[in-house]
């Protein structure tokens, strides 16, 4: 099997981004542009991955991380793509091939690169090319009209009128034989208007030496689109999101509008899932069968089981939701929360680091934190757990079949025993007995002949 090395060129500053952040660290679908390229490279199971970095290099390494499968190669001066690959040459194998990728071309697909590599041998060169309706500004692929073999790549400024009509362009992504790569790089020249060493000049060397040049093409043009400014970044963001939506719809997901939907991680859906507009899914999210996510919800690292419904404007993060639950609208489920089956969490309710057992309801205007709640519990409007004493968090235990009246404060640590009822407006500071009514209120008083204070209009 052919050994494959990968070199990712990520040294550019990205002046047109108008940002102090290196271009390859700008986020696309919730993670740095360069991370997308690395993820795709890893699907190829390469022998090694070399990342050529330059501008903002230490920050790039810090954000991406020094993973064991990465070799970081510094390009102190940005002297062109050929010069960049030459910096990685000492780390590459003597045999096999090298795939050259770009750190600012984040959406090329694994299947596209695998098809490219399948055409590679140790005695040829393979280019990823694409046909564009408007190829203006790109280097044209010039082929022999009889054999269809590549003769040259002609840059726009050097192209004749007939060559400018050619729609096939060079993407820059290529597979090079390691056995010839060193000699080719040594013979590159910077005698051009930019004073740089261009990797594409290798193609002319290969043609002159009679070395076969093969080509392959992606399924979609946007796969090979690069990011040079924030307009292009926004275009690729939408292309990526639309591609993700298309894949999910092919699996049966129903979108109210696939153009108003974002995945910033990984979303896995069961059958008959419905997703309304302006929903965002971050990290790892799994939706079971017949789940409905209404408009303007954010789910981050969440499992939502079969038949559950999340109503509009709800935020759920690092939590598990059981079957047939109802959440929201305007609910916030914070990290460490587990909702068992058939739990109802209503409007303006916040739950943090709590376990809510099946068939319990927290329907209105409540805060539940650091709580173990049993089955069939009803929490009245405005009830809260007071879990923080200013220094430490404490847990509240609410056992099965408890009814908590509205505007109740449960001051942790405290246990409300099975079957208890807590009267509205109570502040509970001690454990309650099982099956009894517990309340703490001042006696209601009415004062006769009392007059409300009034402002002196004079």
Swiss-Prot record:
InterPro entries given in the database record: Bifunctional_GlmU, GlmU-like, GlmU_C_LbH, Hexapep, MobA-like_NTP_Trfase, Nucleotide-diphossugar_trans, Trimer_LpxA-like_sf
GO terms for cellular component: cytoplasm; membrane
Binding of Mg(2+), residues: 104, 228
This protein's name: Bifunctional protein GlmU
Cell location: Cytoplasm
Cofactor: how and how many bound: Binds 1 Mg(2+) ion per subunit.
Binding site for acetyl-CoA: 381, 387-388, 406, 424, 441
Catalytic residue list: 364
Organism this protein belongs to: Nitrosomonas europaea (strain ATCC 19718 / CIP 103999 / KCTC 2705 / NBRC 14298)
Pfam entry (one): NTP_transf_3
Residues where UDP-N-acetyl-alpha-D-glucosamine binds: 9-12, 23, 75, 80-81, 139, 155, 170, 228, 334, 352, 367, 378
Domain of life: Bacteria
Swiss-Prot/TrEMBL catalytic activity: alpha-D-glucosamine 1-phosphate + acetyl-CoA = N-acetyl-alpha-D-glucosamine 1-phosphate + CoA + H(+); N-acetyl-alpha-D-glucosamine 1-phosphate + UTP + H(+) = UDP-N-acetyl-alpha-D-glucosamine + diphosphate
Pyrophosphorylase: annotated span: 1-230
């Amino acid at each position: 099997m052919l050994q494959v090395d990968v070199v990712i060129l990520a040294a550019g500053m990205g002046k047109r981004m108008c940002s102090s952040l290196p271009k390859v660290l700008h986020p696309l679908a919730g993670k740095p542009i360069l991370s997308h390229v690395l993820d795709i490279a890893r699907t190829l199971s390469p022998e090694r991955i070399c990342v050529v970095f330059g501008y903002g290099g230490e920050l790039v390494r810090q954000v991406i991380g020094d993973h064991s499968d990465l070799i970081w190669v510094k390009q102190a001066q940005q002297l062109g793509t050929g010069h960049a690959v030459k910096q990685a040459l000492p780390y590459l194998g003597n045999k096999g091939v090298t795939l050259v990728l770009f750190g600012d071309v984040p959406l090329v697909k694994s299947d596209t690169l695998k098809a490219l590599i399948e055409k590679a041998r140790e005695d040829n060169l393979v280019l990823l090319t694409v046909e564009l309706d408007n190829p203006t500004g790109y280097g044209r692929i010039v082929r022999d009209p009889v054999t269809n073999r590549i003769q040259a790549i002609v840059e726009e400024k050097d192209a004749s009128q007939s060559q400018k009509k050619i729609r096939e362009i060079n993407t820059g992504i290529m597979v090079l034989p390691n056995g010839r790569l060193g000699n080719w790089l040594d013979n590159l020249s910077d005698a051009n208007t930019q004073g740089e060493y261009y990797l594409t000049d290798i193609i002319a060397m290969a043609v002159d030496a009679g070395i076969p040049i093969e080509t392959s093409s992606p399924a979609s043009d946007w796969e090979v689109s690069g990011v040079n400014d924030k307009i292009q970044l926004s275009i690729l963001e939408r292309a990526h999101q639309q591609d993700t939506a298309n894949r999910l719809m092919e699996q049966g997901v129903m979108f109210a509008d696939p153009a108003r939907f974002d995945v910033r991680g990984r979303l896995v859906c069961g059958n008959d899932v419905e997703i309304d507009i302006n929903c965002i899914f971050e990290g790892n999210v799994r939706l079971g069968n017949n789940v409905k996510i209404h408009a303007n919800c954010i789910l981050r690292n969440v499992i939502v089981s079969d038949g559950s419904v999340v109503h509009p404007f709800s935020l759920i993060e690092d939590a598990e939701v059981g079957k047939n639950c109802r959440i929201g609208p305007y609910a916030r489920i914070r990290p460490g929360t587990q909702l068992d089956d058939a739990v109802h969490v209503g409007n303006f309710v916040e739950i943090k680091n709590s376990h809510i057992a099946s068939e319990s309801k927290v329907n209105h205007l409540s805060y539940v934190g650091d709580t173990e709640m049993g089955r069939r519990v009803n929490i009245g409007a405005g009830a809260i757990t007071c879990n923080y004493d200013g220094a430490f968090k404490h847990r509240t235990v609410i056992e099965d079949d408890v009814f908590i009246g509205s505007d109740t404060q449960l001051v942790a640590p405290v246990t409300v025993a099975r079957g208890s009822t807590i009267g509205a407006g109570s502040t509970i500071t001690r454990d309650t007995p099982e099956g009894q009514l517990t309340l703490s209120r001042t006696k209601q008083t009415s004062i006769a002949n009392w007059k409300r204070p009034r402002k002196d209009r004079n």
